[in-house]
Amino acid sequence: MVCVPSSSSVMELANLISQSIPKLQDESPQRANDARGNVIEACSKMLALVTSPAEMLKEMVLINLASLQVINHYQIASVVPLNGHIPISELANKCGLPVDILRRILRQAMTYGAFSEPEPDCIAQTDVSREIPRLSPLLTYQLDVCLPSMVRLLDWLKDVDGEHACAYQIAHDTKDTWWSYASKRPELIENYGKYMALITSGGAHDVSYVLKGFAWEKLGNAVVVDVGGADGFVGISLAKEYPNLAVIVEDNLGLKDSADDNIPQHLKSRVVFLPHSFFKPQSALSRDADVFLLRHILHDWNDNDCRAILQALAASMKPGASILVAEQILQRPGAASWQRERVMRALDMQMMIQFGSKERAYEDWDALFKSVDPPLEIVDCVQPVGSADSFMELKRRA
């Protein structure tokens, strides 16, 4: 049965789009970004209104992901010239794929805008396909690591109290957490670091919001520990912006070479990488820190593991020191924009599937912090305009 949308609802959305489009060129980046968000949300809602429920469900299949996974794995977008075109037989030979198989995969990908066929059996780039090499770390993580986990969610739910902590462990036939599993596979850790740097460059998770979410300038000469800081991209940004800060980046030993390469020569006196597990007490070097930054760390862990991480920090903090937790705060259904809620709920599902963890509401965060021994309390919470993350400053309760 086809659902007929209300013409007034469709017109309201069309009017919103018409009103927002001129603002896309606004001199204010924030106003332009808000207008862009309005257009995306209105278009998404309009599509949902005019698409029948059956059509909507059919669109949610994994076929698009299958072709995209092949394109990313074989680096096809890096072989197709940026301008002009390439015969599909030559492309297939360079990628090591049968011509007929490649033709079918690419023609399916063309239905969602990736590549074009300007002449029979000749492949050319589109704006979409040109982005694939840049986004490869994200695609590799989502399609090669997360996708197999997603399709095992049902198996995990059938034995949710069993030996596996999440669907990821079933998919990859391991009892290890993702982090333990990846630590034995340097290519996974390296790609994950690139993935994190990619998703925090632009958009609602941009690293610039770290600079706005806390009064760093008021610290004066201070030491900041970027706990679980990957290859140092956040710590480097802090040190560049605030010359009085010294930054210690802590993470897996496998990231040390990448971090050392990333740190500019002129910052090496103020930014250092220190191999460290955040489940263990801080080293003598880090115990003198004024701020311990936990950015996108705790949502990867269940409550018990979060308590262990926070407890190790709380026990190491000098008097007056702070923990700064940068995380998404889940809002009640309908409180955020439609598009923002989609992203929040998708991330929450990913945490469940990949880590056996979750995104948390403010009340969840508050209860978690208070359950640490010694208890931690939120003394400030800032969400910069445009940021998906809130910055919660914690102190040991007096």
Swiss-Prot record:
Induction: Expression not regulated by the cluster-specific transcription factor aoiH. Its EC number is 2.1.1.-. CDD domains: AdoMet_MTases. InterPro entries: COMT-like, O_MeTrfase_dom, SAM-dependent_MTases_sf, WH-like_DNA-bd_sf, WH_DNA-bd_sf. The active site is at residue 299. One of its GO terms (biological process) is polyketide biosynthetic process. O-methyltransferase; part of the gene cluster that mediates the biosynthesis of a methylated derivative of known natural products orthosporin and diaporthin. Seems not to be involved in the biosynthesis of the identified final product of the pathway and its function has still to be determined. This is O-methyltransferase aoiO.
